[in-house]
Amino acid sequence: MERTLSIIKPDAVAKGVVGKILDRFESNGLKIAATRKMQLSRADAEAFYAVHSERPFFGDLVDFMISGPVVVSVLEGEGALIKNRNLMGATNPKEAEAGTIRADFAENIDANAVHGSDSLENAAVEIAFFFSEREIS
């Protein structure tokens, strides 16, 4: 069964829309195989987003991701990765289709409510960053 990682970012957690976002996943055929609410440390955020370390937005991204708690989930199902990408919508909420998570809950390209794995290879790495195999059911 295909798996992908979702992070509900601090802006969406602060707005109290975690339940609505998790419901979107389940309503669209994705099983929540593991989930936890946590506060990322600076080291966690820097390690998780290390692929972006040379990009000009890296510092702001890390600061944002440690600004409040996040909800990290493993989503499972047929076509889980692309299904989650479609549910999230475009990275920039102004470009996201109506009815997507980002169109409905995100403020801007920085505070854009959710993160989702962009490939199956990255999904495996990202899932292992947050969860051991025994924590996923």
Curated annotation (Swiss-Prot):
Binding sites annotated in the UniProt record for ATP: K9, F57, R85, T91, R102, N112
Disulphides: none
Protein name: Nucleoside diphosphate kinase
Organism for this UniProt entry: Sulfurimonas denitrificans (strain ATCC 33889 / DSM 1251)
UniProt EC number: 2.7.4.6
Classification via PANTHER family: NUCLEOSIDE DIPHOSPHATE KINASE, NUCLEOSIDE DIPHOSPHATE KINASE DDB_G0292928-RELATED
GO cellular component: cytoplasm
Localisation: Cytoplasm
Catalytic activities: a 2'-deoxyribonucleoside 5'-diphosphate + ATP = a 2'-deoxyribonucleoside 5'-triphosphate + ADP; a ribonucleoside 5'-diphosphate + ATP = a ribonucleoside 5'-triphosphate + ADP
SMART domains listed in its UniProt record: NDK
